[in-house]
């Protein structure tokens, strides 16, 4: 995976695990799906997922507020909801910024 600005998909992650770890394609796919499911399950429960040297995923509550319809200018109530937030680690920020917009090409 290189810093070409492309979007990395599940298939790309599975292929990277297959090539770098040595698992079969089926095992690599199952591994990636298991990790993503575990992260999803934790976030659904409102838990923070902290991955060292990468960052943290967390769920935050947003209260009800008044918004505006941009076309009409009419006030519209926005319901309370939960949003997922990602906060990159200092190490990840440094790697991204020290290698330009393209990132590291390992």
Curated annotation (Swiss-Prot):
Primary role: This protein is one of the two subunits of integration host factor, a specific DNA-binding protein that functions in genetic recombination as well as in transcriptional and translational control.
Family according to the record: Belongs to the bacterial histone-like protein family.
Cysteine pairs bridged by disulfides in the record: none
Keywords from the UniProt entry: DNA recombination, DNA-binding, Transcription, Transcription regulation, Translation regulation
Alphabetical list of PANTHER family matching this protein: DNA-BINDING PROTEIN HU, INTEGRATION HOST FACTOR SUBUNIT ALPHA
Gene: ihfA
Family matches, as SMART domains: BHL (SM00411)
Name of this protein: Integration host factor subunit alpha
Family matches, as PROSITE patterns: HISTONE_LIKE
GO terms, biological process: DNA recombination; positive regulation of metabolic process; regulation of DNA-templated transcription; regulation of translation
A cellular component term, taken from the record's GO annotations: cytosol
GO molecular function: DNA binding; structural constituent of chromatin
Coiled-coil ranges (or none): none
Quaternary structure note: Heterodimer of an alpha and a beta chain.
């Amino acid at each position: 995976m290189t810093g070409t600005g492309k979007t990395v998909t599940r298939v790309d992650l599975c292929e990277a695990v297959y090539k770098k770890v040595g698992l079969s394609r089926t095992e690599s796919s199952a591994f990636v799906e298991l990790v993503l499911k575990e992260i999803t399950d934790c976030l659904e429960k409102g838990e923070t997922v902290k991955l060292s040297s990468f960052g943290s995923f967390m769920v935050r509550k947003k209260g009800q507020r008044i918004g505006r319809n941009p076309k009409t200018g009419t006030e519209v109530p926005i319901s309370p909801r939960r949003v997922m937030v990602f906060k990159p680690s200092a190490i990840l920020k440094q790697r991204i910024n020290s290698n330009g917009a393209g990132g590291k090409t390992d």
